[in-house]
């Protein structure tokens, strides 16, 4: 996820769904695999003199680790390594998850856009095989959640197509992957989720 977009209306939907799922399934921890890609923030013009955005302001409004302070009975862990090398990132994320395997978890994959497209996936996407590898490491009754942004601008339905793609990527039986959404909060985003059986 780009830090530029942290704490917008999509995060209200995202974290609302995640907290509700964790409560529903009596999980004590949410682990966010952030796929962090830091942004270069624009400069501020003060009377014709350009200057950097103060780091304290940027940190206050755009630090993805701020979610860990959510006042709830849940523990929230954020894997915030910079996502710039796909293999190294996946290996490190798998190690991170194995270190947090002692308690029931909801593991949330949070890329910029979502699942890989049919052609030319890039760092905005999670590959099907990467999603499957993480799903495979979950224990029974743990929850897998996945951020998916709208995939087309032509107005065609997109949610079911991506839901089926994720289900196939996970090699899960039909109907395993469900959808969390609120078209009134963020109509261009859904959170897919599945409970490991």
Q: Over which residues does each language-model region extend?
A:
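Class I S-adenosyl-L-methionine-dependent methyltransferase catalytic core
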Residues: 1-197
């Amino acid at each position: 996820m780009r830090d530029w977009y942290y704490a917008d209306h999509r995060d209200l939907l995202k974290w609302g769904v995640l907290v509700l799922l964790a409560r529903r399934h009596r999980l004590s921890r949410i682990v966010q695999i952030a796929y962090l890609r830091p942004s270069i923030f624009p400069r501020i013009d003060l009377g014709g003199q350009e200057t950097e955005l103060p780091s304290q302001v940027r940190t206050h409004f755009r630090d993805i680790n701020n979610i860990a302070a959510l006042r709830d009975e849940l523990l929230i862990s954020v894997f915030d390594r910079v996502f710039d090398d796909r293999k190294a990132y996946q290996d490190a994320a798998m190690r991170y998850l194995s270190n947090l395997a002692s308690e029931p978890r909801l593991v949330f994959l949070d890329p910029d856009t979502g699942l890989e497209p049919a052609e030319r996936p890039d760092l905005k996407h999670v590959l099907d095989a990467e999603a499957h590898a993480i799903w495979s490491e979950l224990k029974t009754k743990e929850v897998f959640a996945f951020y998916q942004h709208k995939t087309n601008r032509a107005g065609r339905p997109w949610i079911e197509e991506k839901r089926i793609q994720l289900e196939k990527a996970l090699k899960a039986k039909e109907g395993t992957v469900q959808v969390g959404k609120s078209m009134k909060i963020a109509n261009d985003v859904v959170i897919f989720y599945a409970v490991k059986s």
